[in-house]
Amino acid sequence: MRAVVQRVKKARVTVAGEEIATIGPGLLVFLGVGQQDGPADVEYLADKIAGLRIFADEDGKMNLSVRDTGGEVLAVSQFTLYGDCRKGRRPSFTAAAPPEQALNLYRQFVAALAARGLKVATGRFQADMLVALENDGPVTMLLDSQRLF
């Protein structure tokens, strides 16, 4: 399971001209689910993201988590995080989980964040979304449940 985590001042998701989710200060998380992923991957990333200290404390040091700041999380499913561009010019997405498996694990991930006391908004699974964000910093982290990076 892979995540691109961005510290934001605000973010929103629009589908077919309708705003379906919006958050204030917090994290925008793009989540990719791989074929081999399961509940342990969900728990690892939810725990890592909930506790990731990428917000400034009173001394200006990155020392606070989204939970510490009372920030929100916008979780957006993104299978393209499993795009393999090593061969040719067209990405291969064969490592991405099939939709049914990905939806199940995405829902588990959202629930795991909420269980850790976070307010979580979501994109719409398999929808063509417009995601707008105001990146804070910018601060962007790449996470992988297999600890590849």
UniProtKB/Swiss-Prot annotation:
A motif (Gly-cisPro motif, important for rejection of L-amino acids) lies at residues 137-138. Signal peptide: none annotated. The gene is dtd. A Gly-cisPro motif from one monomer fits into the active site of the other monomer to allow specific chiral rejection of L-amino acids. HAMAP family: Deacylase_Dtd. It is found in: Cytoplasm. InterPro entries: Daa-tRNA_deacyls_DTD, DTD-like_sf. Its EC number is 3.1.1.96. Its main location: cytoplasm. This is D-aminoacyl-tRNA deacylase. Belongs to the DTD family. It comes from Moorella thermoacetica (strain ATCC 39073 / JCM 9320). GO terms for biological process: D-amino acid catabolic process. It catalyses: glycyl-tRNA(Ala) + H2O = tRNA(Ala) + glycine + H(+); a D-aminoacyl-tRNA + H2O = a tRNA + a D-alpha-amino acid + H(+). Homodimer. Pfam families: Tyr_Deacylase (PF02580). SUPFAM superfamilies: DTD-like. Keywords: Cytoplasm, Hydrolase, RNA-binding, tRNA-binding. GO terms for molecular function: D-tyrosyl-tRNA(Tyr) deacylase activity; Gly-tRNA(Ala) deacylase activity; Ser(Gly)-tRNA(Ala) hydrolase activity; tRNA binding. The keyword Cell cycle does not apply. An aminoacyl-tRNA editing enzyme that deacylates mischarged D-aminoacyl-tRNAs. Also deacylates mischarged glycyl-tRNA(Ala), protecting cells against glycine mischarging by AlaRS. Acts via tRNA-based rather than protein-based catalysis; rejects L-amino acids rather than detecting D-amino acids in the active site. By recycling D-aminoacyl-tRNA to D-amino acids and free tRNA molecules, this enzyme counteracts the toxicity associated with the formation of D-aminoacyl-tRNA entities in vivo and helps enforce protein L-homochirality.
